[in-house]
């Protein structure tokens, strides 16, 4: 089950990167990890460095992707972003959530809809 969840999550992140590139975001980093926090995608859009949490769903059985980015998750993302920003200096930051919804088709995840929530928290 864990391998399945990871492959669906990876497919969602790949779809989010393609979506963001079409929207003229410059991808700076992916899967940035520190102890206690991870950021799925770090991108640049205009004057902002954007820290993006991606949630991939094949059903609403466990709630929407946006609902999964609760206060605890937000705090972990913010902590990781603070560490990342140390190497960038004084920049403006924003926190977005990208929700990728789709269906499992055989062994592949087929994207049906992408919702991008800017300034999510």
Question: Model-found features: residue ranges?
Answer:
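Conserved catalytic cores of phosphodiester-cleaving nucleases, focusing on short active-site segments
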Residues: 20, 41-60, 69, 77
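Mid-chain, well-packed structural core segment of small domains
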Residues: 62-91
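Mixed-charge, glycine-accented linear interaction segment located at domain edges/termini
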Residues: 32-34
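Short hydrophobic-acidic sequence motifs that mark active-site Asp/Glu residues
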Residues: 38, 42, 49-53, 94, ...
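Short glycine/proline- and charge-enriched loop/turn segments
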Residues: 3, 56-61, 118
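Acidic-basic catalytic patches of nuclease active cores, encompassing PD-(D/E)XK
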Residues: 1-30
């Amino acid at each position: 089950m864990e391998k399945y969840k990871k492959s669906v999550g990876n497919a969602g992140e790949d779809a989010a990167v393609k979506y963001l590139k079409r929207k003229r975001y410059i991808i700076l980093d992916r899967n940035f990890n520190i102890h206690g926090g991870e950021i799925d995608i770090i991108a640049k859009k205009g004057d902002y460095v954007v820290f993006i949490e991606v949630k991939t769903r094949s059903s609403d059985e466990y709630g929407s992707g946006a609902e999964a980015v609760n206060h605890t998750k937000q705090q972990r993302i913010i902590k990781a972003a603070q560490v990342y920003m140390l190497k960038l200096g004084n920049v403006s930051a924003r926190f977005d959530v990208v929700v990728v919804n789709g269906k499992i088709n055989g062994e592949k995840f087929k994207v049906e809809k992408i919702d991008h929530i800017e300034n999510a928290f």
